[in-house]
């Protein structure tokens, strides 16, 4: 089953195995304490539900435009039925029989800050099904999200015979099967999983020792320890590799691990090297937190009417259609003269923030005024053609002014994206976005990648 977003045929289908949760946020305000106890009174709560656990990882992968099958314990209880309804437009669900009910995680937030979390429903998977075994047996790419509620255990023999690309472990889950290509524990989880020679405490050295010990103990190809705003540390050879997060964003990190695992699995499935997959996953997770984490993911249920994006040359019509269907319009801008890895990474991360991405491109005259003689190297028609060929770009709009403010006023995007090289500077378009409730955000940018630097190196080499 395809989701509201068009499935990209150039992306390898992904099977996600694990434990599905139903996440619920109750968000309100708190300006006083209860008279009978020193606890805040949260009032005027708005309720929102979304997929959690393996279901969130699968949902995020589907939002990337990938064909996804989720194998998880989902029953006919109210939480299970709600989860089925949320996921149905996006992916194929192969339910495993469940003893008990789907686990629910409820967060109460005041001014977007967690006050308390309530957990209920301790359902566990009883057994595997033939349908699940068959789906795994012919899967080209597998992600395991093991929260210790029986899904991975029930299918362990099949997983052992066909090691997954990525295994996202959690404290109550078991070890990954030998041969797994990449395991993605968080820093605290890695310390808990590490054998006796693992280094206790925090810091990069402890993470490196723990990761190396887990590679040996689990007999897997690689372990990457996620470090929050510091990035991730990858161990798969003689020396560890630190992949820093290009820009630190301290926000709601709920779901960031699922975003990391889903991105890494997708990149590996499409042929990326492990180091490339981790770098892409760090960027995606950083962008995810910057946009508000799982709480900011557009509600799955409200998007069921969204059809595949139209093949249109009218960015304004596309933006209007997405808004009318309660979707999120994302825009990014630049010259994009010599398209490089920094551009591509930025645009891929931007696309994950909403339901369409419109790229605003400077005209040739605008580039000349801003960059000087000799620019652009590539004329506008070529730059637009290359951008339209990217799977993450849904439409391209051109502006002739020095800034895209007029064009943004016409498109009225919900999110305006700039690269991390603007970090510390005021975004000139931020005030304009506020006029219609939009948000300007910084996303990670690969250091050292720029068209100007490429031209300088080319000129140096020609001497």
Swiss-Prot record:
Q: Which SUPFAM superfamilies match?
A: Nucleotidylyl transferase, Ribokinase-like
Q: Where is this region: Ribokinase?
A: 1-313
* Any Pfam family the entry gives: PfkB
User: Could you say which EC number(s) this protein's record lists?
Assistant: 2.7.1.167, 2.7.7.70
Q: Which UniProt keywords apply?
A: ATP-binding, Carbohydrate metabolism, Kinase, Multifunctional enzyme, Nucleotide-binding, Nucleotidyltransferase, Transferase
The Gene Ontology biological process annotation of the record reads: ADP-L-glycero-beta-D-manno-heptose biosynthetic process; DNA-templated transcription initiation
Matching entries from InterPro entries are given as: Archaeal_FAD_synthase, Bifunc_HldE, Cyt_trans-like, PfkB_dom, RfaE_dom_II, Ribokinase-like, RNA_pol_sigma70, Rossmann-like_a/b/a_fold
Q: What class of enzyme is it?
A: transferase
Which region ranges are annotated with the description Cytidylyltransferase?
331-463
Q: Give the pathway.
A: Nucleotide-sugar biosynthesis; ADP-L-glycero-beta-D-manno-heptose biosynthesis; ADP-L-glycero-beta-D-manno-heptose from D-glycero-beta-D-manno-heptose 7-phosphate: step 1/4; Nucleotide-sugar biosynthesis; ADP-L-glycero-beta-D-manno-heptose biosynthesis; ADP-L-glycero-beta-D-manno-heptose from D-glycero-beta-D-manno-heptose 7-phosphate: step 3/4
Top-level taxonomic group: Bacteria
Chain coiled-coil ranges:
none
Q: Where is the active site?
A: 258
Q: Which residues cross the membrane?
A: none
Q: Which GO terms describe its molecular function?
A: ATP binding; DNA-binding transcription factor activity; heptose 7-phosphate kinase activity; heptose-1-phosphate adenylyltransferase activity; phosphotransferase activity, alcohol group as acceptor
Q: Which transformation does this protein catalyse, written as a reaction?
A: D-glycero-beta-D-manno-heptose 7-phosphate + ATP = D-glycero-beta-D-manno-heptose 1,7-bisphosphate + ADP + H(+); D-glycero-beta-D-manno-heptose 1-phosphate + ATP + H(+) = ADP-D-glycero-beta-D-manno-heptose + diphosphate
Q: Which family does it belong to?
A: In the N-terminal section; belongs to the carbohydrate kinase PfkB family.
What's this chain's function? Catalyzes the ADP transfer from ATP to D-glycero-beta-D-manno-heptose 1-phosphate, yielding ADP-D-glycero-beta-D-manno-heptose.
Q: Which HAMAP family match?
A: HldE
State the oligomer form and interacting partners: Homodimer.
Name by which UniProt lists this protein:
Bifunctional protein HldE
